[in-house]
Amino acid sequence: MAKEKYERTKPHVNIGTIGHVDHGKTTLTAAISKVLHEEYPDVNPEYDFNQIDSAPEEAARGITINIAHIEYQTEKRHYAHVDCPGHADFVKNMITGAAQMDGAILVVAATDGPMAQTREHVLLARQVGVPKILVALNKCDMVDDDELIELVEEEVRDLLDENGFDRDCPVIHVSAYGALHDDAPDHEKWVEQIKKLMDAVDDYIPTPVHDLDKPFLMPIEDVFTISGRGTVVTGRVERGKLPVNSNVEIVGIRPTQTTTVTSIETFHKQMDECEAGDNTGLLLRGINRDQVERGQVLAAPGSVTPHTKFEGEVYVLTKDEGGRHSPFFSNYRPQFYFRTTDVTGVITLPEGVEMVQPGDHATFGVELIQPIAMEEGLTFAVREGGHTVGSGRVTKIIE
């Protein structure tokens, strides 16, 4: 069966839900897709809630581990929505997920207010450069006291303000459960609130200015074999555009290879080209499954080079932010998380600097054990034992 062509008629925006594990991110994602399906059925597929909440680990512990990608349209825009994992153990996915957002919906239960993970996600959103956050105050059907809701709202605004986000952002009172279930009390009211939330998303989260004119680059998130066709890599195009049948280089981790992209798909639809912001799958000619891996990038030939030695400027998280409890010294060996993967590196502090304390802003040299496609300005997280302990950017490439 011939696949539908993907039509680029409306502005495309990547958003996601972030926040504490039991506050209803996945239920809200399902409610948004249901309400929009009912309002604009010709452009919005119907998603089953279980499709969004489908990680196998989930049934046992009720926590979202994987990232669900769904798409929907409002009158003004086309959205790709990621439902981000909510648990601290899965911060690594949070980093790859949050890096995919032009804006985020922070879900906070009115019954609980902001929790530790709420704070961690807002901090992470700041670190990975999510430009705007607005708030869905969920479970409002379970709180009778308006004053209590106002207090929680104020607390959320303070939290955003502390992390460099706009405290005057839209805060929409919702009940994801009430909107999702036709037989819930006040169902119509909660459906209207979801519409109000999406109006706020349309108006408040700016249409991203994608770097279309820069050379093509796509970080590889996943690699598949499609029998009879070959190797497909998936990811979100970071910049530039790529017509089908173009040559690309596979850069990082291993020696650079050149290949041709023979097919481009997004959300199971064929495309003639992909561009910055698209979540896409690219079929690579003559490349085996074991020749390519997550953490590499596909790039326009000659546009980016692999490096192991650089200087970085880093903010080191405090203990309260979930960072280290003690200082580190030269020869400290954490992981450096670039785009989609961790690579171990050795830190060399500058002369005259004996140690770096939690809460410090520091500049130091790094030598990675594997090369990464790197440019000045590239951001990374410093991680240790599964926890983010620092956030930085490459200031100078050495070799």
Curated annotation (Swiss-Prot):
* Compartment(s): Cytoplasm
Tell me where on the tree of life, at the top rank, the source sits: Bacteria
Q: Where is this region: G5?
A: 175-177
Q: Give EC number(s), comma-separated.
A: 3.6.5.3
User: Which intervals hold domain tr-type G?
Assistant: 10-209
Classification via SUPFAM superfamilies: EF-Tu/eEF-1alpha/eIF2-gamma C-terminal domain (SSF50465), P-loop containing nucleoside triphosphate hydrolases (SSF52540), Translation proteins (SSF50447)
- Location of the region described as G2 in the Swiss-Prot/TrEMBL record: 62-66
User: What is this enzyme's catalytic activity, as reactions?
Assistant: GTP + H2O = GDP + phosphate + H(+)
- State what this protein does: GTP hydrolase that promotes the GTP-dependent binding of aminoacyl-tRNA to the A-site of ribosomes during protein biosynthesis.
The name on file for this protein is: Elongation factor Tu
Q: To which species is this protein native?
A: Bifidobacterium adolescentis (strain ATCC 15703 / DSM 20083 / NCTC 11814 / E194a)
